[in-house]
Amino acid sequence: MSWQTYVDEHLMCDIDGQASNSLASAIVGHDGSVWAQSSSFPQFKPQEITGIMKDFEEPGHLAPTGLHLGGIKYMVIQGEAGAVIRGKKGSGGITIKKTGQALVFGIYEEPVTPGQCNMVVERLGDYLIDQGL
């Protein structure tokens, strides 16, 4: 299965029977290389991925400045140290799951809820971890 298929079929999937077209997603290597992404995923700067990786290594690193992706600032909210970073901006937000080799991103806006985004992103991340990725 290609990485793009994981994005298209597992991250951009329908949630509870409704299209999640308000969700942007990507799978990005720890080095910032894009493995696959949805067409709506923002163009990001390498230093934004560096900051995200640093927060996984040192939880709380992004809390004072916020999480930035594609020039958009998200307020960092409760996550799982070293495993999941969550951010909020207005009625939407972001979930990032770290695997052994990649970062799985989900960006959402209403009507998608934080819990729905978390479930989709973390489920794929857990699967990739189980596969040694």
UniProtKB/Swiss-Prot annotation:
Phosphothreonine PTM positions: 113
Pfam families hit by this protein: Profilin
Domain of life: Eukaryota
Disulfide bonds: 13-117
Subcellular location: Cytoplasm, Cytoskeleton
A GO molecular-function annotation: actin monomer binding
Subunit: Occurs in many kinds of cells as a complex with monomeric actin in a 1:1 ratio.
Family that this chain belongs to: Belongs to the profilin family.
Note: The variability of the residues taking part of IgE-binding epitopes might be responsible of the difference in cross-reactivity among olive pollen cultivars, and between distantly related pollen species, leading to a variable range of allergy reactions among atopic patients.
Name listed for the protein in its UniProt record: Profilin-1
Organism from which the protein derives: Betula pendula (European white birch)
Gene for this chain: BETVII
